[in-house]
Amino acid sequence: MFSKRILSKHKNRLKNQSISINGNKVILMAKELQHALNDYLWRTDIELSELDDTKPLRIKYEQFLEVYKEELKHKGIWSRRFAIVTYDGKHIGNCMYYDMDDYKLQTEIGIMIGDKTYWNSGYGSDSIKTLIEYLFNTTSINRIYLHTLEWNKRARASFLKAGFVEVKRVIRGGNMFVLMEILRTIAAPNNN
């Protein structure tokens, strides 16, 4: 019975795949094929890969595109990926939630502003705030958390600005990360 209740919640969450969520500076929209080229360019960028603690992709765009198309067809029920788009229609980055846990009432999030001309302009903070508001208003999640590289001061400042607090340092893959979280009671005390 418990698993049916959880699965039912997730099926309801997936009914409206083509949602868009408006922030003050950005719109979070479901990923589409039109976002593939930017995603490829950002995932092959050395600096962006370092900030995401990954290796740059070393495959051809055509190969990437085939995988991308398959990912768009098979959307998961425990995660969702969004394109971050400005109000003038420019795709500047991506964010997502994943590892949605309806038992612990928590999920992890991630973000990347891939277009570097939009760094240090509040687009990342607005994207995070918009995603937080969406999650707390449409799910039963009480805790949203993330891991960011300790040396990535820009990201940490953006997360703090969005209401996250630093919880502890953790080592993952040989790198030091800061675990940060925001709780529903802190983010929206009137929405308990």
Where are the regions that the model predicts?
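Alpha-helical elements of Rossmann-like donor-binding domains used by nucleotide-donor carbohydrate transfer enzymes
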Residues: N38, Q63-E70, D126, T130
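Acyl-donor (CoA/ACP) binding surface of acyl/acetyltransferases
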Residues: M1-A36, R81, T86-N192
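Conserved GNAT-fold acetyl-CoA-binding loop/helix
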Residues: E47-K69
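Short amphipathic alpha-helix that is part of the acyltransferase structural core
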Residues: E32-D52
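A short linear boundary/processing microfeature
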Residues: D45-I46, T54, K161, V165
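A short helix-loop-beta-strand connector motif used in the catalytic cores of GNAT acetyltransferases and
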Residues: E70-A83
